[in-house]
Amino acid sequence: EYCLQEAGCSLEDIDSIAINTQPTANYLKKIMHVLKYRVSISLIRDRFKNAIARKSLRDSLKECFPKQKFVGEIKNIEHHLAHLSSSFHVSPYEKATVVSVDGFGDFSSGCWGVGTGEKIEIEGRVYYPHSLGSFYQAITQFIGFPNYGDEYKVMGLAPYGKPAYLDKMKKIVLLKPDGTYSLDLRYFIFHKDKVSYEWDGGLPFVGRLFSDELINLLGPMRNSADKLSQFHMDIAASAQAMFEEALFHMLNTLYSRHGLDNLCLAGGCGNNSVANGKILSMTNFKNIYVAASAGDAGGAIGAAYSTYFEENKRNVKDTAMRHAYLGPEFDNVDISAILKKYIKELPSEDFSINLIDSVEDLSQKTAEALTKGKVVGWFQGRMEWGPRALGNRSILGDPRRSDMKEILNIKIKRRESFRPFAPSILREYVSEWFEQDDEVPFMMKVFPIKESQRSKIPAVTHVDGSGRLQTVCSETNPRYHSLIKAFHSMTGVPIVLNTSFNENEPIVYSPEQALNCFLRTKMDVLVLNDYFICRR
Protein backbone atom coordinates (compact mmCIF):
# COMPACT_ATOMS: atom_id res chain seq x y z
CA GLU A 1 0.00 0.00 0.00
CA TYR A 2 2.85 2.36 0.89
CA CYS A 3 4.70 1.59 -2.36
CA LEU A 4 1.58 2.20 -4.44
CA GLN A 5 0.95 5.47 -2.61
CA GLU A 6 4.54 6.65 -3.12
CA ALA A 7 4.44 5.73 -6.81
CA GLY A 8 1.10 7.47 -7.27
CA CYS A 9 -0.58 4.48 -8.85
CA SER A 10 -3.14 1.78 -8.09
CA LEU A 11 -3.04 -2.00 -8.24
CA GLU A 12 -4.58 -1.90 -11.71
CA ASP A 13 -1.51 -0.04 -13.00
CA ILE A 14 0.92 -2.79 -11.98
CA ASP A 15 2.17 -5.01 -14.81
CA SER A 16 3.85 -7.67 -12.66
CA ILE A 17 4.28 -8.72 -9.06
CA ALA A 18 7.52 -10.61 -8.51
CA ILE A 19 8.14 -12.98 -5.60
CA ASN A 20 11.56 -14.18 -4.50
CA THR A 21 10.80 -17.89 -4.59
CA GLN A 22 10.16 -20.47 -7.29
CA PRO A 23 8.60 -23.62 -5.80
CA THR A 24 9.41 -25.73 -8.87
CA ALA A 25 13.14 -24.89 -8.76
CA ASN A 26 15.43 -27.91 -8.26
CA TYR A 27 12.37 -30.16 -8.12
CA LEU A 28 14.25 -33.36 -9.00
CA LYS A 29 16.84 -32.69 -6.29
CA LYS A 30 14.03 -32.29 -3.77
CA ILE A 31 12.62 -35.70 -4.68
CA MET A 32 16.05 -37.33 -4.48
CA HIS A 33 16.61 -35.72 -1.07
CA VAL A 34 13.34 -37.14 0.29
CA LEU A 35 14.27 -40.63 -0.90
CA LYS A 36 17.88 -40.45 0.31
CA TYR A 37 17.28 -39.14 3.84
CA ARG A 38 13.85 -40.70 4.51
CA VAL A 39 12.42 -37.30 5.36
CA SER A 40 9.63 -37.27 7.96
CA ILE A 41 6.03 -37.06 6.76
CA SER A 42 5.42 -33.95 8.90
CA LEU A 43 8.25 -32.11 7.12
CA ILE A 44 6.86 -33.04 3.68
CA ARG A 45 3.38 -31.94 4.78
CA ASP A 46 4.74 -28.55 5.93
CA ARG A 47 6.50 -27.97 2.62
CA PHE A 48 3.28 -28.63 0.67
CA LYS A 49 1.35 -26.26 2.96
CA ASN A 50 3.89 -23.51 2.27
CA ALA A 51 3.69 -24.09 -1.48
CA ILE A 52 -0.11 -23.89 -1.43
CA ALA A 53 -0.02 -20.69 0.64
CA ARG A 54 2.29 -19.03 -1.87
CA LYS A 55 -0.08 -19.84 -4.73
CA SER A 56 -2.94 -17.95 -3.06
CA LEU A 57 -1.36 -14.52 -3.65
CA ARG A 58 -4.22 -13.29 -5.82
CA ASP A 59 -6.66 -14.12 -3.03
CA SER A 60 -4.46 -12.22 -0.57
CA LEU A 61 -4.46 -9.19 -2.87
CA LYS A 62 -8.26 -9.29 -3.03
CA GLU A 63 -8.43 -9.26 0.76
CA CYS A 64 -5.95 -6.39 1.12
CA PHE A 65 -7.30 -4.32 -1.78
CA PRO A 66 -11.04 -5.13 -2.00
CA LYS A 67 -11.76 -2.05 -4.16
CA GLN A 68 -8.92 -2.65 -6.62
CA LYS A 69 -8.24 -5.40 -9.12
CA PHE A 70 -4.87 -6.82 -10.07
CA VAL A 71 -4.86 -7.90 -13.70
CA GLY A 72 -1.10 -8.24 -14.15
CA GLU A 73 1.21 -11.22 -14.05
CA ILE A 74 2.64 -12.93 -10.97
CA LYS A 75 6.24 -13.95 -11.51
CA ASN A 76 8.23 -16.34 -9.37
CA ILE A 77 11.95 -15.55 -9.30
CA GLU A 78 14.31 -18.24 -8.01
CA HIS A 79 15.40 -17.37 -4.47
CA HIS A 80 19.12 -16.93 -5.05
CA LEU A 81 18.72 -15.16 -8.37
CA ALA A 82 16.65 -12.61 -6.44
CA HIS A 83 19.43 -12.34 -3.84
CA LEU A 84 22.07 -11.79 -6.53
CA SER A 85 19.92 -9.18 -8.23
CA SER A 86 19.26 -7.40 -4.91
CA SER A 87 22.97 -6.64 -4.67
CA PHE A 88 24.30 -6.46 -8.24
CA HIS A 89 21.46 -4.52 -9.85
CA VAL A 90 21.65 -1.78 -7.21
CA SER A 91 25.47 -1.72 -7.12
CA PRO A 92 27.60 0.92 -8.87
CA TYR A 93 29.31 -1.78 -10.98
CA GLU A 94 28.79 -2.58 -14.64
CA LYS A 95 30.40 -6.00 -14.17
CA ALA A 96 31.07 -8.02 -11.00
CA THR A 97 31.40 -11.44 -9.45
CA VAL A 98 28.09 -12.08 -7.67
CA VAL A 99 27.69 -14.36 -4.65
CA SER A 100 24.71 -15.33 -2.49
CA VAL A 101 25.09 -17.36 0.71
CA ASP A 102 22.32 -18.06 3.23
CA GLY A 103 20.49 -20.79 5.15
CA PHE A 104 18.63 -22.07 2.15
CA GLY A 105 15.97 -21.06 -0.34
CA ASP A 106 14.47 -22.99 -3.25
CA PHE A 107 16.64 -25.92 -2.19
CA SER A 108 20.03 -24.25 -2.51
CA SER A 109 22.13 -22.43 0.07
CA GLY A 110 24.80 -20.82 -2.06
CA CYS A 111 24.92 -19.43 -5.57
CA TRP A 112 27.47 -17.55 -7.65
CA GLY A 113 28.13 -16.20 -11.10
CA VAL A 114 28.88 -13.02 -13.02
CA GLY A 115 26.73 -9.94 -13.45
CA THR A 116 27.17 -7.86 -16.60
CA GLY A 117 24.90 -4.92 -17.37
CA GLU A 118 21.39 -6.12 -16.66
CA LYS A 119 22.19 -9.83 -16.99
CA ILE A 120 23.26 -12.28 -14.30
CA GLU A 121 24.78 -15.57 -15.42
CA ILE A 122 24.63 -18.19 -12.66
CA GLU A 123 27.60 -20.56 -12.74
CA GLY A 124 27.11 -22.84 -9.77
CA ARG A 125 25.35 -23.63 -6.52
CA VAL A 126 25.66 -25.37 -3.20
CA TYR A 127 22.51 -27.39 -2.63
CA TYR A 128 20.49 -28.04 0.51
CA PRO A 129 21.17 -29.40 3.11
CA HIS A 130 24.80 -28.25 2.87
CA SER A 131 24.62 -24.69 4.18
CA LEU A 132 26.92 -22.19 5.86
CA GLY A 133 23.88 -20.34 7.16
CA SER A 134 22.41 -23.47 8.76
CA PHE A 135 25.81 -24.30 10.28
CA TYR A 136 26.03 -20.85 11.87
CA GLN A 137 22.43 -21.01 13.06
CA ALA A 138 23.00 -24.42 14.64
CA ILE A 139 26.03 -23.16 16.57
CA THR A 140 23.99 -20.11 17.58
CA GLN A 141 21.43 -22.48 19.12
CA PHE A 142 24.17 -24.58 20.73
CA ILE A 143 25.49 -21.46 22.52
CA GLY A 144 21.99 -20.84 23.89
CA PHE A 145 20.47 -18.28 21.51
CA PRO A 146 17.34 -20.07 20.22
CA ASN A 147 15.50 -17.34 18.34
CA TYR A 148 15.42 -16.73 14.62
CA GLY A 149 17.98 -14.08 13.72
CA ASP A 150 20.13 -14.49 16.85
CA GLU A 151 23.27 -15.06 14.79
CA TYR A 152 24.36 -11.45 15.31
CA LYS A 153 24.78 -12.28 19.01
CA VAL A 154 27.40 -14.89 18.12
CA MET A 155 29.22 -12.28 16.02
CA GLY A 156 29.24 -9.95 19.01
CA LEU A 157 30.34 -12.69 21.42
CA ALA A 158 33.13 -14.12 19.23
CA PRO A 159 35.77 -11.42 19.96
CA TYR A 160 35.65 -12.36 23.65
CA GLY A 161 36.92 -15.84 22.79
CA LYS A 162 39.64 -17.63 20.86
CA PRO A 163 39.09 -20.12 18.01
CA ALA A 164 40.20 -22.97 20.25
CA TYR A 165 37.71 -25.39 18.68
CA LEU A 166 38.40 -24.60 15.03
CA ASP A 167 39.77 -28.10 14.46
CA LYS A 168 36.40 -29.51 15.57
CA MET A 169 34.50 -27.02 13.41
CA LYS A 170 36.49 -28.36 10.45
CA LYS A 171 34.92 -31.76 11.10
CA ILE A 172 31.50 -30.14 10.68
CA VAL A 173 32.19 -27.91 7.65
CA LEU A 174 34.26 -29.55 4.92
CA LEU A 175 35.99 -27.40 2.31
CA LYS A 176 36.21 -28.78 -1.22
CA PRO A 177 38.94 -28.20 -3.85
CA ASP A 178 36.44 -26.50 -6.18
CA GLY A 179 35.87 -23.66 -3.70
CA THR A 180 32.62 -24.98 -2.27
CA TYR A 181 31.82 -26.66 1.04
CA SER A 182 29.63 -29.37 2.53
CA LEU A 183 28.38 -30.32 5.98
CA ASP A 184 28.98 -33.59 7.77
CA LEU A 185 25.29 -34.33 8.25
CA ARG A 186 25.88 -36.59 11.25
CA TYR A 187 25.87 -33.40 13.30
CA PHE A 188 22.44 -32.18 12.09
CA ILE A 189 18.79 -33.21 12.01
CA PHE A 190 17.14 -30.34 10.08
CA HIS A 191 17.55 -32.14 6.73
CA LYS A 192 15.33 -35.07 7.69
CA ASP A 193 13.13 -34.04 10.64
CA LYS A 194 10.60 -31.26 10.96
CA VAL A 195 12.02 -28.10 12.56
CA SER A 196 9.41 -25.99 14.34
CA TYR A 197 9.13 -22.24 13.82
CA GLU A 198 7.02 -20.76 16.59
CA TRP A 199 6.43 -17.53 18.50
CA ASP A 200 7.52 -17.64 22.13
CA GLY A 201 6.91 -14.54 24.24
CA GLY A 202 6.78 -12.35 21.14
CA LEU A 203 10.03 -13.79 19.75
CA PRO A 204 10.40 -16.16 16.77
CA PHE A 205 11.69 -19.48 18.14
CA VAL A 206 13.38 -22.04 15.89
CA GLY A 207 13.46 -25.74 16.74
CA ARG A 208 16.78 -27.48 17.21
CA LEU A 209 18.83 -27.99 14.04
CA PHE A 210 21.66 -30.14 15.39
CA SER A 211 21.95 -33.73 16.58
CA ASP A 212 23.38 -35.22 19.75
CA GLU A 213 26.54 -35.94 17.73
CA LEU A 214 27.33 -32.21 17.82
CA ILE A 215 27.11 -32.26 21.62
CA ASN A 216 29.38 -35.31 21.70
CA LEU A 217 31.88 -33.41 19.52
CA LEU A 218 31.83 -29.98 21.20
CA GLY A 219 30.57 -30.57 24.72
CA PRO A 220 27.39 -29.60 26.61
CA MET A 221 25.08 -27.06 24.99
CA ARG A 222 24.05 -23.97 26.94
CA ASN A 223 20.50 -23.30 28.06
CA SER A 224 19.48 -19.71 27.39
CA ALA A 225 19.13 -18.97 31.12
CA ASP A 226 22.64 -20.19 31.95
CA LYS A 227 25.57 -17.83 32.38
CA LEU A 228 27.90 -17.47 29.42
CA SER A 229 31.32 -19.02 30.05
CA GLN A 230 34.67 -18.76 28.31
CA PHE A 231 33.84 -22.07 26.66
CA HIS A 232 30.84 -20.51 24.91
CA MET A 233 32.90 -17.50 23.86
CA ASP A 234 35.54 -19.81 22.37
CA ILE A 235 32.85 -21.77 20.53
CA ALA A 236 31.53 -18.49 19.08
CA ALA A 237 35.03 -17.45 18.00
CA SER A 238 35.61 -20.88 16.44
CA ALA A 239 32.32 -20.80 14.52
CA GLN A 240 33.04 -17.30 13.22
CA ALA A 241 36.54 -18.39 12.15
CA MET A 242 35.11 -21.44 10.35
CA PHE A 243 32.49 -19.32 8.59
CA GLU A 244 35.13 -16.87 7.42
CA GLU A 245 37.46 -19.62 6.22
CA ALA A 246 34.69 -21.20 4.14
CA LEU A 247 33.54 -17.86 2.72
CA PHE A 248 37.05 -16.70 1.78
CA HIS A 249 37.76 -20.15 0.30
CA MET A 250 34.84 -19.63 -2.08
CA LEU A 251 35.64 -15.98 -2.85
CA ASN A 252 39.31 -16.64 -3.57
CA THR A 253 38.37 -19.47 -5.92
CA LEU A 254 35.98 -17.18 -7.78
CA TYR A 255 38.55 -14.40 -8.03
CA SER A 256 41.09 -16.84 -9.48
CA ARG A 257 38.49 -17.98 -12.00
CA HIS A 258 37.27 -14.57 -13.21
CA GLY A 259 39.83 -11.98 -12.12
CA LEU A 260 37.12 -9.37 -11.62
CA ASP A 261 37.87 -6.61 -9.09
CA ASN A 262 34.23 -6.06 -8.10
CA LEU A 263 32.24 -8.30 -5.76
CA CYS A 264 28.53 -8.12 -4.95
CA LEU A 265 27.50 -10.13 -1.90
CA ALA A 266 23.97 -11.06 -0.82
CA GLY A 267 21.97 -13.61 1.15
CA GLY A 268 21.44 -13.76 4.90
CA CYS A 269 25.13 -14.54 5.44
CA GLY A 270 25.85 -11.17 3.83
CA ASN A 271 24.78 -9.71 7.18
CA ASN A 272 27.96 -11.09 8.75
CA SER A 273 29.60 -7.68 8.92
CA VAL A 274 32.71 -9.05 10.65
CA ALA A 275 33.49 -11.31 7.68
CA ASN A 276 32.53 -8.57 5.20
CA GLY A 277 35.08 -6.23 6.75
CA LYS A 278 37.88 -8.73 6.12
CA ILE A 279 37.16 -9.49 2.45
CA LEU A 280 39.48 -6.78 1.10
CA SER A 281 42.39 -8.08 3.18
CA MET A 282 41.68 -11.81 2.80
CA THR A 283 40.94 -11.85 -0.97
CA ASN A 284 42.12 -9.99 -4.06
CA PHE A 285 38.82 -8.20 -4.65
CA LYS A 286 39.22 -4.41 -4.78
CA ASN A 287 35.60 -3.28 -4.40
CA ILE A 288 32.77 -4.85 -2.42
CA TYR A 289 29.07 -4.00 -2.45
CA VAL A 290 26.75 -5.45 0.18
CA ALA A 291 23.17 -4.27 -0.15
CA ALA A 292 21.32 -2.48 2.66
CA SER A 293 19.14 -5.55 3.15
CA ALA A 294 21.18 -8.63 2.30
CA GLY A 295 18.63 -11.08 3.71
CA ASP A 296 15.28 -12.27 2.43
CA ALA A 297 13.63 -8.84 2.68
CA GLY A 298 16.12 -7.62 0.09
CA GLY A 299 14.90 -10.42 -2.16
CA ALA A 300 11.85 -8.26 -2.85
CA ILE A 301 14.05 -5.69 -4.61
CA GLY A 302 15.94 -8.48 -6.35
CA ALA A 303 12.78 -10.15 -7.60
CA ALA A 304 11.49 -6.81 -8.91
CA TYR A 305 14.74 -5.94 -10.70
CA SER A 306 15.11 -9.46 -12.14
CA THR A 307 11.68 -9.07 -13.68
CA TYR A 308 12.26 -5.48 -14.82
CA PHE A 309 15.56 -6.25 -16.54
CA GLU A 310 14.05 -9.06 -18.58
CA GLU A 311 12.84 -6.35 -20.95
CA ASN A 312 14.75 -3.19 -19.98
CA LYS A 313 18.34 -1.98 -20.17
CA ARG A 314 20.28 -1.05 -17.04
CA ASN A 315 21.85 2.34 -16.46
CA VAL A 316 24.12 2.14 -13.41
CA LYS A 317 23.69 5.85 -12.68
CA ASP A 318 19.93 5.35 -12.38
CA THR A 319 19.87 2.10 -10.42
CA ALA A 320 22.84 2.40 -8.03
CA MET A 321 21.55 2.48 -4.45
CA ARG A 322 23.82 4.82 -2.49
CA HIS A 323 21.54 5.29 0.50
CA ALA A 324 18.73 3.40 2.21
CA TYR A 325 16.33 6.26 3.02
CA LEU A 326 13.33 4.89 1.11
CA GLY A 327 10.60 4.59 3.74
CA PRO A 328 7.81 6.81 5.09
CA GLU A 329 8.47 10.40 6.13
CA PHE A 330 6.44 12.88 8.16
CA ASP A 331 6.44 16.67 8.06
CA ASN A 332 6.19 19.19 10.89
CA VAL A 333 2.43 19.45 10.41
CA ASP A 334 2.06 15.72 11.12
CA ILE A 335 4.31 16.00 14.16
CA SER A 336 2.56 19.08 15.51
CA ALA A 337 -0.77 17.25 15.38
CA ILE A 338 0.67 14.29 17.30
CA LEU A 339 2.24 16.55 19.94
CA LYS A 340 -1.15 18.18 20.52
CA LYS A 341 -2.65 14.73 20.95
CA TYR A 342 -0.04 13.90 23.60
CA ILE A 343 -0.16 17.27 25.38
CA LYS A 344 -1.26 15.68 28.70
CA GLU A 345 1.69 13.27 28.63
CA LEU A 346 4.10 16.18 28.02
CA PRO A 347 3.41 18.69 30.84
CA SER A 348 5.55 21.83 30.64
CA GLU A 349 6.91 21.32 34.15
CA ASP A 350 8.47 18.00 33.01
CA PHE A 351 9.25 18.62 29.34
CA SER A 352 10.34 21.50 27.13
CA ILE A 353 9.30 21.54 23.46
CA ASN A 354 10.96 23.88 20.98
CA LEU A 355 10.55 24.24 17.23
CA ILE A 356 13.97 24.97 15.69
CA ASP A 357 13.67 25.58 11.96
CA SER A 358 17.40 26.04 11.32
CA VAL A 359 19.27 22.78 10.61
CA GLU A 360 22.48 24.34 11.89
CA ASP A 361 20.88 25.47 15.16
CA LEU A 362 19.14 22.12 15.62
CA SER A 363 22.43 20.30 15.03
CA GLN A 364 24.23 22.52 17.54
CA LYS A 365 21.60 22.01 20.24
CA THR A 366 21.51 18.25 19.70
CA ALA A 367 25.31 17.95 19.66
CA GLU A 368 25.47 19.96 22.87
CA ALA A 369 23.03 17.53 24.50
CA LEU A 370 25.22 14.61 23.40
CA THR A 371 28.33 16.19 24.93
CA LYS A 372 26.47 16.40 28.25
CA GLY A 373 25.88 12.64 28.23
CA LYS A 374 22.25 12.85 27.13
CA VAL A 375 20.64 9.94 25.27
CA VAL A 376 18.97 11.35 22.15
CA GLY A 377 16.19 9.88 20.03
CA TRP A 378 16.81 11.14 16.48
CA PHE A 379 13.79 10.88 14.15
CA GLN A 380 14.30 12.51 10.75
CA GLY A 381 13.13 12.21 7.13
CA ARG A 382 12.52 8.90 5.43
CA MET A 383 12.81 5.66 7.35
CA GLU A 384 15.70 3.35 6.48
CA TRP A 385 15.22 0.27 4.27
CA GLY A 386 16.82 -2.81 5.82
CA PRO A 387 17.70 -3.98 9.34
CA ARG A 388 19.97 -1.08 10.34
CA ALA A 389 19.18 2.34 11.79
CA LEU A 390 21.27 4.72 9.69
CA GLY A 391 20.63 8.12 11.21
CA ASN A 392 16.94 8.67 10.52
CA ARG A 393 15.42 6.33 13.14
CA SER A 394 18.33 6.23 15.59
CA ILE A 395 19.16 6.57 19.26
CA LEU A 396 22.40 8.52 19.66
CA GLY A 397 25.01 8.86 22.38
CA ASP A 398 28.47 10.28 23.07
CA PRO A 399 31.08 7.69 21.95
CA ARG A 400 33.72 9.24 24.24
CA ARG A 401 31.97 8.10 27.41
CA SER A 402 33.12 4.72 28.69
CA ASP A 403 29.81 4.34 30.56
CA MET A 404 27.56 5.12 27.58
CA LYS A 405 26.94 1.42 26.78
CA GLU A 406 25.78 0.87 30.35
CA ILE A 407 23.66 4.04 30.29
CA LEU A 408 21.90 2.93 27.10
CA ASN A 409 21.28 -0.57 28.43
CA ILE A 410 19.88 0.75 31.72
CA LYS A 411 17.72 3.49 30.18
CA ILE A 412 16.47 1.78 27.03
CA LYS A 413 18.00 -1.29 25.46
CA ARG A 414 18.39 -3.81 28.32
CA ARG A 415 20.34 -6.13 26.04
CA GLU A 416 23.37 -8.39 26.51
CA SER A 417 26.43 -6.48 27.70
CA PHE A 418 28.73 -8.16 25.18
CA ARG A 419 26.91 -6.66 22.18
CA PRO A 420 28.68 -3.60 20.76
CA PHE A 421 27.18 -0.27 19.70
CA ALA A 422 28.01 1.20 16.31
CA PRO A 423 29.93 4.33 15.31
CA SER A 424 28.49 6.69 12.67
CA ILE A 425 31.42 8.62 11.22
CA LEU A 426 31.77 11.46 8.74
CA ARG A 427 32.97 9.82 5.51
CA GLU A 428 35.86 12.27 5.13
CA TYR A 429 37.46 11.15 8.41
CA VAL A 430 37.36 7.36 8.06
CA SER A 431 41.06 7.02 7.21
CA GLU A 432 42.01 8.93 10.38
CA TRP A 433 40.08 6.64 12.70
CA PHE A 434 39.95 3.19 11.04
CA GLU A 435 42.59 0.86 9.62
CA GLN A 436 40.65 0.58 6.35
CA ASP A 437 39.23 3.42 4.27
CA ASP A 438 36.03 2.50 2.49
CA GLU A 439 32.42 3.57 1.98
CA VAL A 440 30.11 1.73 4.38
CA PRO A 441 26.75 3.50 4.04
CA PHE A 442 24.68 0.54 5.28
CA MET A 443 26.72 -0.48 8.36
CA MET A 444 27.56 -3.82 6.72
CA LYS A 445 31.28 -4.00 7.56
CA VAL A 446 33.37 -4.14 10.73
CA PHE A 447 36.82 -2.52 10.57
CA PRO A 448 39.63 -2.31 13.14
CA ILE A 449 39.76 1.10 14.82
CA LYS A 450 43.24 2.61 14.84
CA GLU A 451 44.94 1.73 18.10
CA SER A 452 45.79 5.37 18.80
CA GLN A 453 42.10 6.33 18.57
CA ARG A 454 40.43 3.53 20.52
CA SER A 455 40.69 5.15 23.94
CA LYS A 456 38.96 8.28 22.58
CA ILE A 457 35.77 6.41 21.62
CA PRO A 458 35.36 3.56 24.15
CA ALA A 459 31.57 3.38 23.79
CA VAL A 460 31.83 2.19 20.16
CA THR A 461 35.08 0.22 20.39
CA HIS A 462 34.46 -3.50 20.74
CA VAL A 463 36.62 -5.71 22.93
CA ASP A 464 38.85 -6.58 19.94
CA GLY A 465 39.33 -2.93 18.97
CA SER A 466 36.86 -3.02 16.09
CA GLY A 467 33.76 -1.04 15.15
CA ARG A 468 30.80 -1.76 12.85
CA LEU A 469 30.86 1.61 11.20
CA GLN A 470 28.43 3.63 9.12
CA THR A 471 29.93 6.28 6.87
CA VAL A 472 27.82 9.44 6.62
CA CYS A 473 27.91 11.75 3.58
CA SER A 474 26.40 15.21 3.25
CA GLU A 475 25.01 14.25 -0.18
CA THR A 476 22.89 11.36 1.08
CA ASN A 477 21.99 12.50 4.61
CA PRO A 478 22.76 16.22 5.04
CA ARG A 479 20.93 16.56 8.36
CA TYR A 480 22.71 13.67 10.08
CA HIS A 481 26.00 14.85 8.59
CA SER A 482 25.34 18.32 9.99
CA LEU A 483 24.74 16.91 13.48
CA ILE A 484 27.96 14.84 13.50
CA LYS A 485 29.86 17.81 12.08
CA ALA A 486 28.60 19.97 14.95
CA PHE A 487 29.62 17.29 17.46
CA HIS A 488 33.05 17.13 15.80
CA SER A 489 33.46 20.91 16.14
CA MET A 490 32.72 20.70 19.86
CA THR A 491 34.75 17.59 20.70
CA GLY A 492 37.28 16.89 17.94
CA VAL A 493 35.57 13.51 17.38
CA PRO A 494 33.73 13.08 14.03
CA ILE A 495 31.73 10.15 15.38
CA VAL A 496 28.50 9.56 17.30
CA LEU A 497 27.22 6.34 18.83
CA ASN A 498 24.27 5.06 16.81
CA THR A 499 21.80 2.33 17.75
CA SER A 500 18.33 1.54 16.49
CA PHE A 501 15.37 3.58 17.76
CA ASN A 502 13.47 0.85 19.58
CA GLU A 503 13.05 -0.92 22.88
CA ASN A 504 12.83 -4.69 22.26
CA GLU A 505 10.45 -4.10 19.36
CA PRO A 506 10.68 -3.23 15.65
CA ILE A 507 12.37 0.07 14.84
CA VAL A 508 9.92 2.96 15.18
CA TYR A 509 8.57 4.26 11.88
CA SER A 510 6.13 7.01 12.89
CA PRO A 511 6.40 10.08 15.17
CA GLU A 512 3.77 8.53 17.44
CA GLN A 513 5.82 5.35 17.89
CA ALA A 514 8.93 7.45 18.54
CA LEU A 515 7.09 9.53 21.13
CA ASN A 516 5.73 6.43 22.87
CA CYS A 517 9.21 4.93 23.06
CA PHE A 518 10.57 8.22 24.43
CA LEU A 519 7.89 8.42 27.13
CA ARG A 520 8.16 4.74 28.03
CA THR A 521 11.94 4.79 28.49
CA LYS A 522 14.41 7.10 30.21
CA MET A 523 15.56 8.77 27.01
CA ASP A 524 16.62 12.36 27.70
CA VAL A 525 15.95 14.10 24.39
CA LEU A 526 13.71 13.44 21.40
CA VAL A 527 14.27 15.27 18.12
CA LEU A 528 11.28 14.89 15.78
CA ASN A 529 12.25 16.65 12.55
CA ASP A 530 12.58 20.27 13.78
CA TYR A 531 10.97 19.67 17.19
CA PHE A 532 13.41 19.42 20.08
CA ILE A 533 11.79 17.75 23.12
CA CYS A 534 13.78 17.55 26.35
CA ARG A 535 13.07 16.14 29.80
CA ARG A 536 13.61 18.80 32.44
Where are these regions (language model features)?
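N-terminal cofactor/phosphate-binding cores enriched in small/glycine residues
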Residues: 1-27
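Short, flexible active-site loop motifs that bind/organize anionic cofactors or intermediates
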Residues: 4, 237, 504
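Flexible beta->alpha loop and helix N-cap segments adjacent to enzyme active/binding sites
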Residues: 7-10, 30-43, 49, 54, ...
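Helix-hairpin-helix/helix-loop-helix acidic hairpins
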Residues: 222-236, 240-245
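Phosphate/ATP-binding catalytic cores across multiple sugar-kinase/actin-like superfamilies
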Residues: 237-263
